[in-house]
Amino acid sequence: MIKIYDTMTRSLRDFVPLTENIVNMYVCGPTVYNYIHIGNARSTVAFDTIRRYFEYRGYTVNYISNFTDVDDKIIKAANEAGISTKELSDKFIAAFMKDTAQLGIKPATQNPRVINYMDEIIAFVSTLIDKGFAYVAEGDVYFRVAKSNNYAKLANKTLEDLEIGASGRTDAETDRKENPLDFALWKAAKEGEISWESPWGPGRPGWHIECSVMATEILGDTIDIHGGGADLEFPHHTNEIAQSEAKTGKTFANYWMHNGFVNVDNEKMSKSLGNFVTVHDMLKTVDGQVLRFFLATQQYRKPINFTEKAIHDAEVNLKYLKNTHSLPLTEEVSQAELQTYLDAFQEAMDDDFNTANGVTVLFDMAKWINSGNYDQTVKAAFEKMLQVFGIVFEEEVLDEDIEKLIEERQTARANKDFATADRIRDELAAQGIKLLDTKDGVRWTRD
């Protein structure tokens, strides 16, 4: 059985879906005001890998990942560029889809956009006001955190702790609130900002309400898994839980999953340190499959360190797997031996999607394959395991001239003309084709 580390309970829990063999997942997507950075990519790859493993285990996955296209950062960037917020969002949504395609990300079941859910957002906020969980203040609408049961439990905090931290705050917005911790569900319109009409006057939604509405509209009041980066535990996911459960009276998500951060050369990635790396720029020099492999093979909850050496190692390891995949098939292999690798892989991945252990099994299997165990059944199993990591290798097709040289070398060896055989071997090596003579015949890899 698959076990998931649930952030809410801080424990490993058996995964039991609401509906048998179906997984409903909502993963917070990017705010589309710029190209995604390597930290965004880490989250996208981590949850794509988790989705792929669920599918490997036979589940049908409804995978929802949103685009936040109404936000302070988008408004600021659009104003600076002299274009509409929609034009800016459209540009960076297209860039996101292009970049993530190069990372081997499967298309989501749906990618909802905030601008398409404005009526539903207004209705959601109205319900919270009617139930006494929200109040209007000068055109803004705030959520009453004091009415929320176990507020901030997800972040392992108490309301009392947070109130102590918030004491002494004073600004125009705080003065409008009943409690400094109350958060905005709806923001009154400001000059030069996009807005929509509402019962409280023109304005736009707060950040947290957007995900609650899109998740529940598409997947229902309770979902199986809600995921995102560790930075979203508080306040974003905390506030999603508070407002969603206040509206429905039901558990919002049964499992909460959060991926770890990305450091660059052992330092936190930030613009101020000058180590901020976008995927758009990275893909100019690094193959998307290599970057994917680096990100996918680290255990998703742990921080990872992005370095040139780490990328080089990923490239070397991926090349080894590719060469293994391209080996010619052998005679029938012991299915019992194959099963030991399949069982070990499942055991690793069932343990909270431990890709670090899973990829170790993959390399053990590759070593076994290279020792002459590669029939069609083994190849199919190897490919399915690779696909969990988002890796798909195209079949290598040798040029006719190279195939002819290999055949000529085989003939020369059969005739004990070893000088000719060695000459052809050297000629092939110069073209990047490495030959290996085995009991099952000649095998080749491309350097």
How would you label these PLM feature ranges?
Residues M97-D119, E233, G288-V290, L295-A296, ...:
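Non-catalytic interaction-recognition regions
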Residues F67-D71, I93-F96, K106-I121, G139-S148:
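Short, glycine/charge-rich beta-strand/loop segments that flank catalytic centers
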Residues T9-L12, L18-G104, D440, W444:
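N-terminal, positively charged nucleic-acid-binding surface of large information/translation enzymes
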Residues M1-Y33, D48, K98, D119-L327:
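Alpha-helical recognition segments enriched in aromatics with Gly/Pro capping
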